[in-house]
A protein has these predicted regions:
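Conserved active-site histidine-acidic residue motif and adjacent donor-binding/catalytic loop
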Residues: 50-51, 66-80, 94-96
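Conserved catalytic-core segment of nucleotide-activated headgroup transferases in glycan assembly
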Residues: 3-62, 71-74
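Conserved phosphate-coordination/catalytic loops
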Residues: 24-27, 68-71, 94, 129-133
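Catalytic binding pocket for nucleotide-activated donors in carbohydrate/polymer assembly enzymes
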Residues: 85-147
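Short, conserved active-site loop motifs that form the nucleotide-linked donor/cofactor pocket
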Residues: 65-67, 124-125
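Hydrophobic/aromatic ligand-binding patch that stacks against planar heteroaromatic rings
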Residues: 36, 80, 102
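Structured loop/turn residues at beta-strand edges in well-structured enzyme cores
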Residues: 61-64, 82
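A structural micro-motif
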Residues: 43, 64-66, 108
Length: 148
């Protein structure tokens, strides 16, 4: 796993991607993550976990748009949430830190699959598990509306 230098700022560590998303997880098996990383190379994927990451996730660091935050702290979480444009609810197991509620409070859209959806409000966009390309299109359509 890449180790960030303590002398680098948060912006230096995440690079100059035009768009940012986050995934809070407690597993190394994030649903369709590799497909999404490939299909959305201009989106930085910030993946946060309260523990260390397993091999299935660490091996995806070959993609420059994947940034892993093992054993994250509240300050790191806040900095990531200040940077993201949307949230991907694609963690297939238990929700971490009631993150969908936090994302709704921030007024950001959430994209998820039927098998990973943790939101009970009906405010997010839910796709069938085999509709990865449709999710990519919806994300593209959304980020095209963001003014920079």
């Amino acid at each position: 796993m890449r180790k960030p230098s303590l002398k680098l700022s948060f912006s230096d560590m995440v690079g100059d991607f035009p768009y940012h998303t986050a995934i809070y997880t407690n597993t190394a098996d994030i649903f369709e993550l590799e497909h999404l990383l490939q299909a959305l190379p201009d989106v930085a994927f910030h993946v946060l976990a309260h523990s260390h990451f397993g091999f299935n996730l660490v091996k995806l660091e070959q993609y420059p748009n994947l940034i892993l935050y093992p054993s994250f702290d509240p300050l790191t979480s806040r900095k990531v949430l200040e940077k993201i444009d949307f949230y991907l609810d694609i963690n297939p197991f238990d929700e971490v830190d009631h993150i969908t509620e936090t994302i709704h409070q921030l007024g950001l859209p959430i994209f998820s699959f039927e098998g990973t959806n943790h939101d009970q409000t009906g405010q997010n966009q839910v796709f069938k598990n085999d509709q990865v390309d449709q999710m990519v299109k919806a994300v593209r359509d959304y980020i095209d509306t963001i003014e920079r």
